[in-house]
Swiss-Prot record:
The keyword Iron-sulfur applies. The keyword Transmembrane does not apply. A motif (Cx2C motif 1) lies at residues 279-282. It is found in: Cytoplasm; Mitochondrion intermembrane space. This is Fe-S cluster assembly protein DRE2.
Amino acid sequence: MPVSKSVSPPKRTLLLAPPTLASHSSALSSVLADYDRSVTDLQMLDRLSAGLVKLPSSTYDRVLILADASFMLGESLALMNRAVLGPVAEALKPNGRLQSQDGNSLEESTLSKEAVLAGLVASRGGFEKPDYGDNEGAVTLKFGLKKKNQPAPLADGSVPLNFKKKKPVEVKPVVPVVPAGVGFIDLSDDLDDDDLIDEDTLMTEEDLLRPINIPVECQPKAGKRRRACKDCSCGLAERLVKEDAEKRAEADKKLESVKLATDDLAEIDFTVQGKVGSCGNCSLGDAFRCDGCPYIGLPPFKPGEEVRLLNNDVQL
Protein backbone atom coordinates (compact mmCIF):
# COMPACT_ATOMS: atom_id res chain seq x y z
CA MET A 1 0.00 0.00 0.00
CA PRO A 2 1.62 3.29 -0.99
CA VAL A 3 2.37 5.74 1.81
CA SER A 4 0.97 9.23 1.25
CA LYS A 5 3.42 12.02 1.82
CA SER A 6 2.28 15.29 3.37
CA VAL A 7 3.04 18.20 1.07
CA SER A 8 4.04 21.39 2.88
CA PRO A 9 2.47 24.57 1.52
CA PRO A 10 4.75 26.78 -0.57
CA LYS A 11 6.56 29.53 1.25
CA ARG A 12 5.19 32.98 0.65
CA THR A 13 7.49 35.94 0.03
CA LEU A 14 6.90 39.68 0.39
CA LEU A 15 9.02 42.08 -1.66
CA LEU A 16 9.43 45.64 -0.35
CA ALA A 17 10.45 48.00 -3.17
CA PRO A 18 11.54 51.66 -2.98
CA PRO A 19 9.60 54.24 -5.04
CA THR A 20 12.44 54.83 -7.54
CA LEU A 21 12.44 51.17 -8.53
CA ALA A 22 8.82 51.44 -9.68
CA SER A 23 9.79 54.27 -12.05
CA HIS A 24 12.22 51.89 -13.84
CA SER A 25 9.89 49.26 -15.27
CA SER A 26 12.70 47.24 -16.82
CA ALA A 27 14.59 46.96 -13.53
CA LEU A 28 11.42 46.03 -11.66
CA SER A 29 10.50 43.38 -14.24
CA SER A 30 13.95 41.79 -14.02
CA VAL A 31 13.60 41.54 -10.22
CA LEU A 32 10.13 40.00 -10.36
CA ALA A 33 11.28 37.44 -12.95
CA ASP A 34 13.36 35.70 -10.28
CA TYR A 35 10.34 34.90 -8.06
CA ASP A 36 7.19 32.82 -8.42
CA ARG A 37 4.39 35.38 -8.70
CA SER A 38 1.82 32.93 -7.32
CA VAL A 39 3.46 32.99 -3.88
CA THR A 40 5.10 36.43 -4.07
CA ASP A 41 3.60 39.81 -3.22
CA LEU A 42 5.05 43.23 -4.01
CA GLN A 43 4.48 46.35 -1.90
CA MET A 44 5.92 49.86 -2.13
CA LEU A 45 7.70 51.17 0.95
CA ASP A 46 6.30 54.69 0.63
CA ARG A 47 2.72 53.38 0.64
CA LEU A 48 3.44 51.25 3.71
CA SER A 49 5.01 54.20 5.49
CA ALA A 50 1.97 56.38 4.72
CA GLY A 51 -0.41 53.70 6.05
CA LEU A 52 -2.16 53.22 2.69
CA VAL A 53 -1.56 49.44 2.68
CA LYS A 54 -2.47 46.92 5.38
CA LEU A 55 -0.49 43.66 5.43
CA PRO A 56 -2.15 40.36 6.43
CA SER A 57 -1.12 38.92 9.78
CA SER A 58 1.25 35.89 10.02
CA THR A 59 1.28 35.28 6.26
CA TYR A 60 4.83 35.53 4.91
CA ASP A 61 7.79 33.22 5.49
CA ARG A 62 10.26 35.71 4.09
CA VAL A 63 10.34 39.49 3.57
CA LEU A 64 12.98 40.87 1.20
CA ILE A 65 14.08 44.51 1.06
CA LEU A 66 14.80 45.36 -2.58
CA ALA A 67 17.51 47.75 -3.75
CA ASP A 68 16.87 50.71 -6.04
CA ALA A 69 17.71 50.89 -9.75
CA SER A 70 21.37 51.58 -8.92
CA PHE A 71 21.51 48.47 -6.67
CA MET A 72 21.80 50.54 -3.46
CA LEU A 73 19.83 49.95 -0.25
CA GLY A 74 20.10 53.52 1.06
CA GLU A 75 16.64 54.62 -0.08
CA SER A 76 14.95 51.45 1.17
CA LEU A 77 16.60 51.56 4.60
CA ALA A 78 15.64 55.22 4.99
CA LEU A 79 11.96 54.29 4.53
CA MET A 80 12.11 51.32 6.94
CA ASN A 81 10.92 53.27 9.96
CA ARG A 82 8.81 52.18 12.91
CA ALA A 83 5.57 52.65 10.96
CA VAL A 84 6.78 50.06 8.41
CA LEU A 85 8.61 47.56 10.63
CA GLY A 86 5.64 47.12 12.97
CA PRO A 87 3.24 45.82 10.28
CA VAL A 88 6.06 43.85 8.61
CA ALA A 89 6.89 42.03 11.86
CA GLU A 90 3.20 41.25 12.37
CA ALA A 91 2.91 39.94 8.79
CA LEU A 92 5.79 37.47 9.30
CA LYS A 93 5.06 33.92 10.35
CA PRO A 94 6.86 32.50 13.39
CA ASN A 95 10.48 31.80 12.37
CA GLY A 96 9.94 34.08 9.36
CA ARG A 97 12.93 36.15 8.19
CA LEU A 98 13.51 39.75 7.19
CA GLN A 99 16.58 40.22 4.98
CA SER A 100 17.96 42.22 2.09
CA GLN A 101 17.73 41.23 -1.57
CA ASP A 102 21.47 40.84 -2.04
CA GLY A 103 21.96 38.97 1.24
CA ASN A 104 24.06 41.68 2.87
CA SER A 105 23.91 41.91 6.64
CA LEU A 106 21.27 44.22 8.13
CA GLU A 107 22.44 43.88 11.73
CA GLU A 108 24.69 46.94 11.47
CA SER A 109 22.21 49.03 9.49
CA THR A 110 20.07 51.90 10.69
CA LEU A 111 16.97 49.71 11.05
CA SER A 112 18.59 47.34 13.59
CA LYS A 113 17.19 49.18 16.62
CA GLU A 114 13.69 49.56 15.19
CA ALA A 115 13.61 45.89 14.15
CA VAL A 116 14.40 44.78 17.71
CA LEU A 117 11.73 47.12 19.08
CA ALA A 118 9.25 45.54 16.65
CA GLY A 119 9.90 42.11 18.21
CA LEU A 120 12.44 40.67 15.77
CA VAL A 121 15.72 38.99 16.68
CA ALA A 122 19.00 39.42 14.80
CA SER A 123 19.93 36.17 13.04
CA ARG A 124 22.37 35.31 10.20
CA GLY A 125 22.70 38.77 8.75
CA GLY A 126 18.98 39.53 8.97
CA PHE A 127 16.16 39.43 11.50
CA GLU A 128 13.91 36.56 12.51
CA LYS A 129 10.54 36.46 14.24
CA PRO A 130 10.71 34.14 17.28
CA ASP A 131 8.28 31.24 17.61
CA TYR A 132 6.60 31.38 21.00
CA GLY A 133 4.30 28.42 20.32
CA ASP A 134 0.57 28.31 21.04
CA ASN A 135 0.98 29.94 24.47
CA GLU A 136 2.51 33.07 23.05
CA GLY A 137 2.97 35.60 25.81
CA ALA A 138 0.98 33.55 28.35
CA VAL A 139 2.35 33.77 31.88
CA THR A 140 0.80 31.94 34.82
CA LEU A 141 0.31 34.24 37.77
CA LYS A 142 0.04 33.00 41.34
CA PHE A 143 -1.75 35.30 43.73
CA GLY A 144 -0.79 33.58 46.98
CA LEU A 145 -0.19 30.22 48.62
CA LYS A 146 -2.95 27.65 48.82
CA LYS A 147 -4.50 27.49 52.24
CA LYS A 148 -4.18 24.17 54.06
CA ASN A 149 -7.77 23.78 55.23
CA GLN A 150 -9.31 25.02 52.00
CA PRO A 151 -12.08 22.62 50.83
CA ALA A 152 -11.36 20.67 47.67
CA PRO A 153 -13.45 21.49 44.59
CA LEU A 154 -16.29 19.16 43.71
CA ALA A 155 -16.52 17.07 40.57
CA ASP A 156 -18.55 19.68 38.74
CA GLY A 157 -15.93 22.32 39.51
CA SER A 158 -17.91 24.08 42.23
CA VAL A 159 -16.32 24.96 45.55
CA PRO A 160 -18.25 24.51 48.83
CA LEU A 161 -18.70 27.68 50.83
CA ASN A 162 -17.74 27.96 54.46
CA PHE A 163 -20.38 29.84 56.47
CA LYS A 164 -18.63 29.59 59.84
CA LYS A 165 -18.80 32.77 61.80
CA LYS A 166 -15.53 34.43 62.41
CA LYS A 167 -14.64 35.78 65.80
CA PRO A 168 -15.17 39.51 66.01
CA VAL A 169 -11.95 41.42 66.10
CA GLU A 170 -11.63 43.50 69.21
CA VAL A 171 -10.86 47.09 68.31
CA LYS A 172 -8.85 48.90 70.93
CA PRO A 173 -9.45 52.62 71.28
CA VAL A 174 -6.62 54.77 70.03
CA VAL A 175 -5.11 56.86 72.79
CA PRO A 176 -3.87 60.20 71.46
CA VAL A 177 -0.20 60.78 72.12
CA VAL A 178 0.59 64.22 73.46
CA PRO A 179 3.96 65.59 72.27
CA ALA A 180 6.51 66.53 74.87
CA GLY A 181 6.29 70.13 76.02
CA VAL A 182 2.65 70.57 75.03
CA GLY A 183 0.20 71.44 77.78
CA PHE A 184 -3.47 72.17 78.07
CA ILE A 185 -5.35 75.33 79.03
CA ASP A 186 -7.49 75.10 82.10
CA LEU A 187 -10.73 76.76 81.03
CA SER A 188 -11.96 76.80 84.62
CA ASP A 189 -9.23 79.28 85.56
CA ASP A 190 -10.61 82.80 86.04
CA LEU A 191 -7.24 84.38 85.06
CA ASP A 192 -6.97 86.85 87.91
CA ASP A 193 -4.63 89.83 87.73
CA ASP A 194 -2.52 88.26 90.48
CA ASP A 195 -1.12 85.81 87.93
CA LEU A 196 0.25 88.60 85.69
CA ILE A 197 3.94 89.60 85.90
CA ASP A 198 4.90 93.21 86.61
CA GLU A 199 7.12 94.48 83.80
CA ASP A 200 8.98 96.85 86.13
CA THR A 201 10.36 93.90 88.08
CA LEU A 202 11.92 92.23 85.06
CA MET A 203 15.08 94.44 85.13
CA THR A 204 16.95 95.78 88.15
CA GLU A 205 18.87 99.05 88.51
CA GLU A 206 22.14 97.23 87.86
CA ASP A 207 20.80 95.95 84.55
CA LEU A 208 19.85 99.46 83.46
CA LEU A 209 23.34 100.83 84.27
CA ARG A 210 25.17 98.26 82.18
CA PRO A 211 26.68 99.57 78.90
CA ILE A 212 24.93 98.66 75.70
CA ASN A 213 26.73 95.99 73.71
CA ILE A 214 26.90 97.27 70.14
CA PRO A 215 26.86 94.43 67.59
CA VAL A 216 29.97 93.88 65.48
CA GLU A 217 28.07 94.87 62.32
CA CYS A 218 27.28 98.31 63.80
CA GLN A 219 30.82 99.13 64.96
CA PRO A 220 32.78 101.69 62.86
CA LYS A 221 35.16 100.20 60.29
CA ALA A 222 38.41 101.80 59.14
CA GLY A 223 38.05 103.73 55.90
CA LYS A 224 34.32 103.18 55.66
CA ARG A 225 31.34 105.19 56.79
CA ARG A 226 29.27 103.57 59.45
CA ARG A 227 26.03 102.11 58.21
CA ALA A 228 23.02 101.24 60.31
CA CYS A 229 21.19 97.97 60.02
CA LYS A 230 17.79 97.86 58.36
CA ASP A 231 16.11 97.15 61.69
CA CYS A 232 18.60 99.12 63.82
CA SER A 233 17.72 99.18 67.50
CA CYS A 234 21.00 100.44 69.03
CA GLY A 235 20.50 104.12 68.12
CA LEU A 236 23.11 104.24 65.34
CA ALA A 237 20.53 105.13 62.69
CA GLU A 238 19.36 108.17 64.67
CA ARG A 239 22.93 109.37 65.21
CA LEU A 240 23.75 109.09 61.50
CA VAL A 241 20.65 111.07 60.57
CA LYS A 242 21.61 113.77 63.06
CA GLU A 243 25.18 113.97 61.70
CA ASP A 244 23.90 114.30 58.13
CA ALA A 245 21.57 117.13 59.16
CA GLU A 246 24.43 118.99 60.89
CA LYS A 247 26.69 118.68 57.84
CA ARG A 248 23.96 119.94 55.52
CA ALA A 249 23.23 122.94 57.77
CA GLU A 250 26.93 123.83 57.89
CA ALA A 251 27.22 123.63 54.08
CA ASP A 252 24.17 125.86 53.62
CA LYS A 253 25.66 128.37 56.03
CA LYS A 254 28.94 128.55 54.10
CA LEU A 255 27.07 128.93 50.82
CA GLU A 256 25.09 131.89 52.09
CA SER A 257 28.28 133.62 53.27
CA VAL A 258 29.66 133.83 49.71
CA LYS A 259 28.39 137.19 48.40
CA LEU A 260 29.89 139.50 45.79
CA ALA A 261 30.17 143.26 46.26
CA THR A 262 29.89 145.95 43.59
CA ASP A 263 33.67 146.17 43.27
CA ASP A 264 33.81 142.52 42.31
CA LEU A 265 31.82 143.21 39.14
CA ALA A 266 33.20 144.53 35.84
CA GLU A 267 31.54 146.66 33.14
CA ILE A 268 31.88 145.48 29.55
CA ASP A 269 31.05 147.35 26.35
CA PHE A 270 29.68 144.91 23.81
CA THR A 271 29.96 147.43 20.97
CA VAL A 272 33.62 146.48 20.79
CA GLN A 273 34.24 143.32 18.79
CA GLY A 274 35.50 140.63 21.10
CA LYS A 275 35.58 136.86 21.26
CA VAL A 276 32.50 135.12 19.87
CA GLY A 277 31.31 131.56 19.91
CA SER A 278 31.86 129.12 17.11
CA CYS A 279 28.39 129.80 15.74
CA GLY A 280 28.40 133.55 16.39
CA ASN A 281 24.76 133.46 17.50
CA CYS A 282 25.08 133.40 21.28
CA SER A 283 22.51 136.20 21.65
CA LEU A 284 19.62 134.31 20.04
CA GLY A 285 18.17 133.00 23.28
CA ASP A 286 20.47 130.17 24.35
CA ALA A 287 23.07 130.22 27.12
CA PHE A 288 26.81 130.30 26.32
CA ARG A 289 28.01 126.72 26.06
CA CYS A 290 31.11 126.79 23.81
CA ASP A 291 34.33 125.55 25.39
CA GLY A 292 36.65 128.52 26.15
CA CYS A 293 33.88 131.15 25.89
CA PRO A 294 34.50 133.99 28.40
CA TYR A 295 30.73 134.18 29.05
CA ILE A 296 30.21 130.43 29.60
CA GLY A 297 27.48 129.75 32.12
CA LEU A 298 25.87 133.22 31.86
CA PRO A 299 22.25 133.74 30.79
CA PRO A 300 21.69 135.03 27.25
CA PHE A 301 21.66 138.81 26.68
CA LYS A 302 20.79 141.21 23.92
CA PRO A 303 23.47 142.78 21.71
CA GLY A 304 24.62 146.17 23.01
CA GLU A 305 23.17 145.87 26.52
CA GLU A 306 25.40 146.38 29.54
CA VAL A 307 26.48 143.13 31.19
CA ARG A 308 28.35 142.70 34.43
CA LEU A 309 30.56 139.64 34.75
CA LEU A 310 31.59 137.93 37.97
CA ASN A 311 35.17 137.54 36.79
CA ASN A 312 37.70 140.36 36.26
CA ASP A 313 40.07 138.26 34.16
CA VAL A 314 37.99 138.21 30.98
CA GLN A 315 39.98 139.28 27.91
CA LEU A 316 37.93 141.07 25.24
